[in-house]
């Protein structure tokens, strides 16, 4: 082999080695589509099912790695089934968590009988996602309440068990999640965006003891970004030491925001960039 050909071969081999060394970073970008507050079967949202069908098509066009559905799926078990049938059209794997319209103060048993676990974790590439049931952290059955309604002993016990599980995960994180970007998702956020919502009722956020306990353990887990819904308003803000990525609803608007979904792009350094994709 001539020196010229040898140099060319070495250059090609060097390029290939560099490509394979960098390929985990080149191809590692994670995209998560977030659909929230679909409210199938709600009287005030007569176009909810049609809107969800449109969103499924729009999500598929963007080819995310996974799709998360962050609560308020439907108003009754039959509506859950309708929502799931529509969401079967998604090409990516779908992960669900409940909202306050799915799980009420009587507990998550019905939800679990249809969707399985209401809190868990999953991994996609280098990202670990903690999917949480915010309905175990408060009582959102009374929209008009000016003080936080009491939680039942059963829900308190369930909430304590979820937070204990997170605490155990935090202790084991160095062993199991080394090098992982860790994010969380839940329906009701813990914090307000300054004065928004400008309604002082406790309905809009996790309050009191459970807010403090959850935020403490999520920080120990290394969570900086939390995906949430509930407000029907797409926005990103910082509060409580976290960046909150709030998805718009697909069904109806509470505060005049546009309907649509969120698309989150996560890079290996932990940066989460959110794009809102709106229905026409």
Regions found by a protein language model. Name each.
Residues 29-42, 126-140, 183-185, 243-249, ...:
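Active-site-proximal beta-strand elements of phosphoester/diester hydrolases
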Residues 1-13:
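Bacterial N-terminal signal peptides that target proteins for export
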Residues 41-43, 74-79, 101-107, 137-143, ...:
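Active-site environment of divalent metal-dependent phosphoester hydrolases
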Residues 24-82:
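N-terminal active-site segment of His-dependent metallophosphoesterases
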Residues 37, 67, 72, 99, ...:
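Divalent metal-coordination and catalytic microenvironments
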């Amino acid at each position: 082999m001539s020196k010229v050909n040898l140099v060319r071969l070495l250059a090609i081999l060097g390029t290939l080695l560099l490509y394979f060394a960098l390929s985990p970073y080149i191809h590692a970008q994670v995209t998560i589509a977030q659909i929230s507050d679909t409210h199938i079967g709600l009287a005030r949202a007569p176009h909810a099912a049609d809107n969800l069908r449109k969103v499924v098509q729009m999500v598929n066009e963007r080819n995310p790695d996974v799709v998360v559905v962050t609560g308020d799926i439907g108003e009754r078990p039959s509506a859950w089934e309708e929502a799931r049938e529509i969401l079967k059209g998604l090409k990516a794997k779908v992960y669900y968590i409940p909202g306050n319209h799915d799980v009420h103060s009587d507990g998550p048993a019905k939800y679990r009988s249809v969707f399985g676990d209401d809190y868990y974790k999953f991994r996609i590439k280098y990202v670990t996602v903690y999917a949480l049931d915010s309905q175990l952290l408060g009582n959102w059955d009374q929209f008009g309440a000016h003080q936080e309604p009491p939680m039942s002993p059963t829900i308190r016990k369930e909430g304590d068990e979820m937070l204990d599980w997170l605490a155990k995960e935090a202790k084991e994180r160095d062993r199991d999640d080394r090098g992982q970007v860790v994010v969380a998702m839940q329906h009701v956020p813990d914090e307000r965006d300054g004065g928004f919502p400008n309604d002082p009722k406790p309905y809009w956020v996790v309050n009191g003891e459970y807010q403090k306990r959850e935020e403490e353990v999520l920080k120990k887990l290394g969570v900086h970004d939390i995906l949430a819904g509930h407000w029907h308003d797409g926005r990103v803000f910082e509060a409580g030491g976290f960046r909150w990525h709030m998805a718009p609803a697909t069904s109806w608007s509470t505060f005049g925001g546009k309907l649509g979904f969120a698309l989150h792009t996560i890079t290996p350094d932990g940066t989460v960039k959110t794009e809102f994709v709106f229905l026409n």
